[in-house]
């Protein structure tokens, strides 16, 4: 027999789903899809690769949304049929419970796809980490964060490239940059930008005192080569240095690593992942271009502080999330109030509950 609680949940899910459908109007989406597919069948459109790429992305997004709608509609049809049959066969109630769980998962995915609507959300993401004041303890915390994000990306099926790693004197890192490659990598990671705080008994303190450490995370989207960002030669300073090792990896014997400073903004990027100085310079310029592009967008939106997360003070009061090991274990996001006591799981990359809550918190539903 279907329980009262299950019936209430079904009604709530149906109402939630219908509210989302009203936002996008599937009939209008189908008409828009046919129009764009007609445009793409014209050979002339492919002469402008940038425009063709934008249309292709839009087509893929609409198809994903319509596919989700069809799947959720089938879920509700199965539930309705199951409810009728359960009056004669009480055993069907268990099957309905499973379908309800499935439709709940599908609606959540549908909701996230509606939220990830910025044109840049689909892009790869550059993620940089910088420790705050505190020496070895904060350097170690920064490396813990680097591992956390790399593990999260691996769990999501993304590809991770370590572009730059500057080790700390005793442990951890002074700075690091990774490229997370995969669909919607930037969309998922963009709200991770900010200051992250750790409270623990420091393994580097002989007196075993409790320490508070900070590290900042900055995230910018990788941008297409055909997007024009002017970088004047006189506005940059290029330095070369010997690549630093990370666990015995990524070490070159020559001064192949490159650091580029953009003088007007103070933005500094470096790259040492490639074998040649020329390759590292090209990649560093690409990262700089992405940061300057995002900076320009931020100025237009009057949100410079939000985009330039790494330039904010890395200290108390600016943190977006706290990771506490002493006197209790807790990871808490200060924007969404999402929290968990499973510190080890979070540091091993289980970030989805935080990232999904962020997306809902900052949601701007549009197509």
UniProtKB/Swiss-Prot annotation:
Main location: cytoplasm
Entry PTM: Methylated by PrmC. Methylation increases the termination efficiency of RF2.
InterPro entries: PCRF (IPR005139), Pep_chain_release_fac_I (IPR000352), Pep_chain_release_fac_I_sf (IPR045853), PrfB (IPR004374)
Keywords for this protein: Cytoplasm, Methylation, Protein biosynthesis
Family of the protein in this entry: Belongs to the prokaryotic/mitochondrial release factor family.
Top-level division of the source organism's lineage: Bacteria
NCBIfam families noted in UniProt: prfB
Task performed by this protein: Peptide chain release factor 2 directs the termination of translation in response to the peptide chain termination codons UGA and UAA.
Any one GO molecular function term: translation release factor activity, codon specific
Subcellular localization, as worded in the UniProt entry: Cytoplasm
Name of this chain's protein: Peptide chain release factor 2
Pfam families the UniProt entry points to: PCRF, RF-1
One GO CC annotation: cytoplasm
PTM annotation (N5-methylglutamine): residues: 249
